[in-house]
Curated annotation (Swiss-Prot):
Name under which the protein is recorded: Putative truncated non-structural protein 3b
Family: Belongs to the coronaviruses NS3b protein family.
Length: 40
């Protein structure tokens, strides 16, 4: 019971994190690409 709840919560957190990361990446795509180019 607790394990299932934990997995559900973990999955939910992962989905939320992916959504936030995707939104951030879409907004700052050029900035991230510039940073990656500078670092390498």
């Amino acid at each position: 019971m607790i394990g299932g709840l934990f997995l559900n919560t973990l999955s939910f957190v992962i989905v939320i994190n992916h959504v936030i990361v995707n939104n951030t990446a879409n907004v700052h795509t050029t900035q991230h690409e510039n940073v990656i180019v500078q670092q390498h």
